């Protein structure tokens, strides 16, 4: 059993699929790990409410944080409100294995404080255009895992997945990335394998 839970930060622009990924991870991992979630919204708890409505986890395992300002600040410069939520979950549930911290939607410069997140997953979506990986930024270039979501929309928006693949490799070097479609579950197993491998997670027997 881990003395401290693995904290996985999930960031990305508004509408990229962060909450859908968080839901999918909860449904896939909740029977294998002692799991909890912190979500961030500026003025509401909409993402937390979505997870509760979809029965991602028991409601008491989900804390919705209202940042009241720039979502980037709440995960980077002043992460105190999120750190308090993490501490609250640790006190509430002994022996947590994993806490997912989902940021509010932000721009490509958003990054997590190392005090808040052990691993960072950054989510972008194909509907923003195939040039998005070339724009760079810490999320695209430096996150531990980049998820390129909504690949089913590529034909509808005229995006080239091949171009996104080559541009992402150029921008990220050896850092991993995954193409995904959360509607069908494509890419989810790769994301889970990354979290387990890099986070040294071991499921309870």
UniProtKB/Swiss-Prot annotation:
HAMAP family listed in its UniProt record: UreG
GO molecular function, one term: nickel cation binding
Cellular compartments per GO CC: cytoplasm
Protein name, entry field: Urease accessory protein UreG
Location(s) in or outside the cell: Cytoplasm
Keywords carried by this UniProt record: Chaperone, Cytoplasm, GTP-binding, Nickel insertion, Nucleotide-binding
InterPro entries reported in the protein's UniProt record: CobW/HypB/UreG_nucleotide-bd, P-loop_NTPase, UreG
Family designation: Belongs to the SIMIBI class G3E GTPase family. UreG subfamily.
UniProt xrefs under NCBIfam families: ureG (TIGR00101)
GO terms of biological process kind: urea catabolic process
UniProt function note: Facilitates the functional incorporation of the urease nickel metallocenter. This process requires GTP hydrolysis, probably effectuated by UreG.
Subunit structure: Homodimer. UreD, UreF and UreG form a complex that acts as a GTP-hydrolysis-dependent molecular chaperone, activating the urease apoprotein by helping to assemble the nickel containing metallocenter of UreC. The UreE protein probably delivers the nickel.
Pfam families: cobW (PF02492)
Source superkingdom: Bacteria
Gene3D superfamilies, per database record: P-loop containing nucleotide triphosphate hydrolases
Amino acids binding GTP: 12-19
Disulfide pattern: none
